[in-house]
Amino acid sequence: RSGGESPTAKSASGLYRSGDGGANWTEVTAASNKGFPEKPFGRIAVTVAPSNSNIVYAFVESTDSALFRSDDGGKTWDKRDKSQLMVWRPFYFASLIVDPKNPERLFKPDLGLIQSLDGGKSFANVGGGTHGDSHVVWIDPGDTQHVYVGDDGGLWQSFDGGNKWWKQNNLPVSQFYHVSLDGADPFHVYGGLQDNACWVGDSAYPGGIANAQWENMCGGDGFFMFADPADQDYIYAETQGGAIIRVNRHTHEARDIQPRAGYNEKLRWNWNTPLELSPNEKGTLYMGAQFLFRTRDHGQSWDRISPDLTTNDPQKQKQEESGGVTVDN
């Protein structure tokens, strides 16, 4: 929980415990609850084992982020795991799911999906074959080897506790950041997907449009994507951090055409960098870092056509002093 808007405001996050069904609450602290960490805290994930309500797990973002376990309903705590698998981006990946029948088995969605079979002492990746960035897990209470995981790639299920995974391909859950069309008849659709690359597909196809009619043109997080109006075999596809390629749709030959920094200079790109294609001037694109760039030769070269359009305030570029307990990667 935020302690205020100021970068110097202290976090107001905390863990609270009730012994009377929620009528009254007492904060869990390092001073009164042995083994619990010292403040300040960021995000906290807490869950109670369904088969034993005395067993509580808490993943605490702090200056020493770690997983903690209590065997007495939150009165005392034991630090369990603080490996890189556990603590990576704790402000973002912070949920715990305990097996309904086995309190020693729990999952934590993370960059992948990790699982512990020893009460949180150690974790191993069980998300092999799924997409990255897991967010939610459901364990079948009738058959705890049957598990669903939701991630940036969609929904997956396993029938053997996570050894093998099957994707549910009939769910239209992909998120487009941007789409564009070309001048073909019927026209093609171009778009970048959140954490699922850049794609081009048909707007109409005999028998209907299936997954096979979509072609992958780049990896990463897909953002802006355009077909060259003068030669629609060539596509401009952008991914995170201002990375942009010119790719031949038929040969898939690709070339990096991102504008380069000058000597002893650093360009500052947004995660989703603005990109625009001129509909009137052949081979002309515009792209924005702190400067506006223009190319008139399909990305072979770029001209800087503006001064720094940002405040370039160093005080606003310091993650370590942003008020967060941990910083982003």
What are these regions (language model features)?
Residues 1-329:
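Beta-propeller blade termini and top-face loops
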